[in-house]
Structure formats: C-alpha cells, structure tokens
Design a protein with these regions (language model features):
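N-terminal export signals
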Residues: 2-4, 9-29
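Glycan-processing catalytic domains of CAZymes
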Residues: 33-376
C-alpha cells in the first residue's frame, strides 16, 4: 500500500507546526466523487487519537492510553508507527506522515469515513484530526464528529463551529445531511434537545443540510429514549458487548451478541445505523486503570481476539444487515468500533506494530469482504 513508512522515519519527522485554534483551517481539498457509489453501504470507523504526542500531556487520558501499551505483551496492539524502545516500553507519537499513511490504508480497504471522538484544541487527542485536515490526501476518506450528550447540551463544540465543519467538502453526509454521532451519558435530555434544535436552526439559516443525528447507546431501549428525547434521527452504538463475569469469552459470542443487538435496535421502530465490533479486550486498562475509565472489570473479563477472517465476516454481516433492512437502515451506513481504540478494544482496523513490520492482516481481510459485498 502507498504511503507506508518505517517507524524510524516517522520518528524523524518533527512534531508541531499546526496552527493555533483560532487560525486553524483545513488544507484546500477536492471532495472524493461518490456519485458512482450508487447502492454501496457506507462503512465508517471510530477514531480515538491517543497516539499523537501523548507524552506532551503527562497524566492525561492519552498519556495513560499510550503507556498502557508499554508491557511487551501489548506491543502488538500499538499503531504501526510506534517505536519499541525497551522490553516494556513503546514510544508512540504520530506525525503527518503517519496520518497520510492511515488515510491511504483506510481508503484502499474501502473505509468511507472516520468518526472522530471530539476534543478541544490543545489536547493531543485533537492532533490526529488536525493532521488529517492538513493532509493532501484527506479527500480519500471523509470524516464526521462524534460527541457526548453532555457536550451537545454544553455547546461543545460551539454551534457555529459545527455549522462550519458541516460545510467541509470531506464531511460525511447522508444525502445533503451531515452526520453527527451523539453518545449517551447521564446528561439531562431537555438541555440537549434545546441545543440540537438550535443547531438545526443555525444550519437552516446558513443553508446547510439538516444534520442527521445518531444517538448512541449500548442498550437499544436507552438509545431510543435518548433519540426521542433530543429529537435525533436514528440510533446506533459506540460499542456493545455482553456482560462478562466468568472469564474470557470467544469472539463468536461477541459476534452473536452484536447481531442480536441490531435486531433489538430495529425493534424500537427508529432508524438504525448498525455498529460492528472488531474486539473488546480491555486488559491494558484493567491491569493499569486510567483515572478517566469508569469500568472496573476483572483481568479475565475480556473477549478473546478474533481472527482477521472472523472480524471481516462480522463487518460483512453488518453490511448485509443494512441491505436486508433498507427501510430501517435508511442512512445506508455502518459504524465500526474501531479504527484505533488500541488500548480499550484491541483488534483494531488500523495497521499495528509487530516485530516483523506493519501488521495489516485485519484490514486486508476486511478489504476483501467489503470489495465483494459492495459488488452485490
């Protein structure tokens, strides 16, 4: 695949040079022509960019995530641009070249867009998005924002910023409607509903398409309550997995659970954007709990990683579900967990580090099934 870089070459590239928040603008781009996509199901993947300069913020979420992969047994979960600097130490600090390579990998595999977990300017968690917008290749993979219910209610990002982002040529849309994922939290629904009403009004005033908002929850009925409570357009999930209290479970159990979850979401009567799960092995966070993570699981509570073929078949099933439920899955869309949740879920689509070079076996398997599925 093009733009592939060595780990050492990536480390030689200097970090920095991004514009300040007030002046930041994306590189001028030309949108990828999707007019010939026809009946193709759009496949997105979630990004959580803890891998771009985490050591700039010691003690932060991104710092904990990156150093959670320090033990040798977790090195294989690190993104491909990581550098092994000790038996139990990785240096992970993505660069513009890293992002260019990620875009190329994703585009060649048939990934339509990334859903970026949203963070404020100045956080390393925001650097991945900034590098993406500065890339000469960012028209190859679209993007959209993924925010929390409380963020929506708290006007973060500000309404004016969202309206501006929605006008980016590479912002993912359903027709002319920009996608916006809103993840469940315990925030009051009325405030979020008012904020969403204001966002829709601001979009209308600016001549921007009415946002297509997907309320995300790992419980179908709760997602439906959120969607109806704030006036969202559809439901989906950031991640969903069975309760684990008796030791590791096979990936096949996760696969079956998620397929059942799609039906549960459809049974609410609301439109659905089905999720797909590449894995749910949280052992790095279980063994070295970061302060931001509310889950307190036992070390044996994890999903045994699936093979590349297993993961590809699961994503293929999500695409097939959309095709078989066109009325319910009106946005013609699937969202995959995840592209790069390397410490939380593992088995990510983003190519990863290995002693023998870049491991893109999972992404290659997914590319093969997506190519075949989109030809049907």
């Amino acid at each position: 695949m093009v733009f592939s870089i060595s780990r050492r070459a990536a480390l030689r590239l200097a970090f920095g040079g991004l514009a300040a928040a007030a002046d930041f603008r994306p590189r001028k781009l030309f949108a990828r022509d999707t007019s010939g996509d026809g009946d193709k199901v759009r496949v997105g993947a979630i990004r959580w960019d803890a891998w771009y300069a985490p050591d700039m913020a010691p003690g932060s979420s991104e710092w904990h995530a990156a150093h959670g992969l320090d033990p040798a047994k977790y090195h294989h979960r690190a993104p491909f641009f990581a550098e092994k600097i000790g038996t139990d130490r990785m240096f992970i600090s993505g660069t513009q070249a890293s992002m260019d390579a990620e875009i190329s990998y994703a585009a060649k595999a048939g990934i339509s867009y990334w859903a970026f977990g949203w963070y404020q300017f100045g956080r390393p968690l925001r650097k991945g998005w900034e590098y993406y917008q500065l890339s000469e290749h960012n028209a190859l993979v679209n993007w959209c924002a993924l925010i929390g219910l409380g963020s929506l209610a708290g006007n973060f990002p500000p309404t004016a910023d969202l309206v501006r982002y929605f006008q980016y040529e590479n912002y993912e849309k359903f027709g002319d409607r920009p996608l916006l994922y809103v993840m469940h939290d315990k925030s009051p629904l009325p405030a979020a509903a008012r904020a969403l009403d204001a966002l829709r009004a601001a979009c209308a005033a600016a001549g921007v398409g009415n946002p297509y908002v997907i309320a995300q929850s790992s419980v179908a009925k709760l997602g439906a309550l959120d969607a109806r409570g704030i006036g969202a357009d559809a439901i989906g999930a950031y991640a969903s997995a069975p309760a684990m209290t008796g030791g590791p479970i096979p990936y096949a159990t996760l696969d079956a659970f998620v397929r059942k979850f799609w039906l549960e979401m459809a049974a609410t009567g609301l439109p659905v954007v089905p999720n797909a799960m590449t894995g749910w092995d949280r052992r790095p966070r279980i063994e070295r709990p970061p302060p931001f993570d509310p889950l307190h699981l036992n070390p044996d509570d994890y999903v045994i990683p699936g093979t590349p073929k297993d993961i590809a078949a699961h994503i293929e099933a999500a695409v097939a579900f959309v095709r078989a439920h066109r009325g319910t899955c009106e946005a013609n869309n699937v969202l995959v967990y995840s592209w790069n949740e390397c410490d939380e879920g593992g088995s990510v689509l983003c190519p990863t580090w290995s002693e023998n070079g870049v491991d893109h076996s999972r992404l290659d398997a997914v590319a093969r099934v997506l190519k075949q599925a989109q030809l049907l």
